[in-house]
Design a protein with these regions (language model features):
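Mid-domain catalytic core of redox enzymes
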Residues: 1-71
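Composition- and surface-driven signal marking solvent-exposed, interaction-prone regions
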Residues: 26-29, 71-75, 92-96, 126-127, ...
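Charged, low-complexity, helix-prone segments enriched in Lys/Glu/Asp/Gln
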Residues: 1, 44, 99-106, 136-140
């Protein structure tokens, strides 16, 4: 059977009518990882329609890092969560109306979750948009919008060592110099694979 890929991200992009100074009252650092999953949370349950009200949401403010990432007196905020593989029939099974409804529902649930850290967040929103795993697939060409190459699910392990790098292919002089050369992938996997490729070529 085909190897499973890692879960994709759902990301909400917000433009806020709130200064960086005011935002920093709630977010002491630009990147916040609250660990507050609710009962019933299961990253492997693709049929849970209420998944986004149970998951933890990370927050990142680009404008707290660089104020030029928002107009003066305003701020930018990203909310992000890993999503079960092919959630809700892969976001509506190709039906654009269902896709839009699921996207809006997920967006509102994540904004509600972030409001526990930033009270009244909804009232400050001037702009909002979101990216689903299908969005990431369209722009990155990663299968199913995979966030870090292959699945991190320990039950779907296919490399002997999750941290090992395998750049070899059946094709002579063709090597894998990307995150796909390691089970857990990501930036560390891509760097390790590129390093191994350079060593092999030299």
């Amino acid at each position: 059977s085909a190897a499973a890929v890692s879960e994709g991200f759902f990301t909400v992009y917000l433009g806020l009518n709130m200064s960086n100074q005011e935002l920093s009252r709630y977010m002491k650092v630009p990147h916040v990882f609250p660990l507050d999953v609710q009962p019933g949370y299961d990253i492997y349950n693709s049929e849970d329609a209420d998944f986004f009200s149970k998951t933890t949401v990370s927050l990142y403010s680009p404008s707290m890092v660089n104020p030029r990432h928002a107009p003066e007196g305003k701020s930018s905020l990203m909310l992000q969560a890993l999503v079960p593989y092919h959630w809700m029939n892969n976001w509506g099974g190709g039906d654009k109306e269902i896709y839009a409804t699921l996207k809006e529902k997920a967006m509102e649930a994540m904004i509600d979750s972030a409001s526990r850290l930033i009270p009244g967040l909804q009232e400050y929103i001037e702009y909002k948009d979101a990216a689903t795993p299908l969005t990431y697939e369209r722009y990155t060409h990663n299968s199913d919008g995979a966030s870090s190459a292959w699945s991190w699910n320990p039950k779907k392990k296919f490399y002997n060592n999750l941290m090992s790098v395998n750049i070899e292919t059946p094709v002579k002089n063709l090597y894998i110099g990307s995150c796909w050369a390691m089970q857990i992938g990501g930036v560390p996997g891509a760097l390790a694979a590129a390093y191994q490729c350079v060593k092999k070529i030299n």
